[in-house]
Structure formats: C-alpha cells, structure tokens
Design a protein with these regions (language model features):
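Surface-exposed interaction/ligand-binding surfaces
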Residues: 1-177
Length: 177
C-alpha cells in the first residue's frame, strides 16, 4: 500500500511501522487419506520497519507577510457574482485556490471591505483528489456581501502566497480590484 504524506513540521520525523495481522495456512506433519499434507490456519503479525525522514524547513528569507503555509503550485482567483447591484441586493464573492499541493493545510485570505458593507461568514467548499502524485483540486470560500448604502464600493485586491517547490521560492498572486 502506498500513501501520500504531508509533513507539518521540519526535522527528523519517524514514520511508525505498518503492522498487519494476517491468517496464513501452515503445513503440519500429518497427511490426509489421499497423501496430501494437511494445513492449519495460524494468525501471524507482519510489520514493515519504521522509516526516518528528514523534512527541511521552509526558508525564512523572502517569506511574504500573510503566508499561511501553502506549499505546491497554485492558481488564485477572486470572482464576484455581480458587479452592479440594485438597492437591497447581495452579491457572492468566491475566493478560490486550485492546483497541486497541501490544499487542506492552509487558510484562504479573507476579503477586506468597508464598514458600510456587511460581510457574512463564508461557505467553505473542497473538491480535492489525493492520487499518489499528490493532492490536487480546488478549495474555495463563498462570501455573501450586502452593501448598506448606495454607492461604489471597490473590493481591495487580495493576495495569496505559497511556496513553490519547483522553483524553491515564495510566490504571491494578487487579485485585481
């Protein structure tokens, strides 16, 4: 059996051995009337050895402010459901990260809105697969936004930072206003 592991701390980490209890058939010294060796069931425990791996820490140099632990190769989008509203209408703002990496181990950035706009807690959605090549898919937060007064309210650009294993550098993607 193969498993994808995502370390959450650096240093030397020990992976405990995998143990299985299996039933095996063991030959006895007796034979049946046809001369065949008789077998009995026995329970055996098999164990793989423990493994020690060395996990390098992420570099401190160049770490962006607001870095939340994303490691991999990602795309970042901020998409409003509408750009023009009538009085009393709301809009949904989708903040999404897609790609390959530790998708379940970081938090998405939260939009910053003026005090005259109500921002409700997000609905979190995950569409993730974990094949042996690594975790991939999309995570998103869907915010409902309701302006309290008529006017133009630009949504400030949002930034998402991640560590790109391919280049060995931090990368930051910023949404348009």
């Amino acid at each position: 059996r193969k498993t994808v592991l995502y370390p959450q701390k650096s240093g030397k980490l020990e992976i405990e051995p995998l143990s299985l209890d299996i039933d095996v058939q063991v030959p006895t010294n007796r034979r049946n009337i046809f001369g065949q060796v008789q077998l009995v069931e026995d329970n055996k425990r098999v164990s793989a050895g423990s493994k020690t791996i060395t996990v390098r820490p992420l570099p401190e140099a160049g770490k962006p402010e607001g870095f939340s632990g994303a490691v991999g190769k990602f795309n970042f989008t901020v998409t409003p459901s509408k750009t023009n509203l009538k009085n009393g209408e709301s809009l949904d703002l989708k903040v999404a990260v897609s790609g390959t990496g530790n998708l379940k181990l970081f938090t998405l950035p939260r939009p910053v809105v003026p005090s005259s706009i109500e921002l409700y807690d997000p609905v979190h959605n995950e569409k993730i697969q974990t094949p042996l090549s690594g975790m991939n898919g999309q995570i998103s937060d869907l915010y409902t936004i309701i302006p309290q007064f008529k006017g133009k309210y630009p949504i400030k650009p949002m930034s998402f930072s991640y560590f790109d294993l391919g280049s060995g550098r931090y990368k930051t993607i910023t949404s348009p206003e």
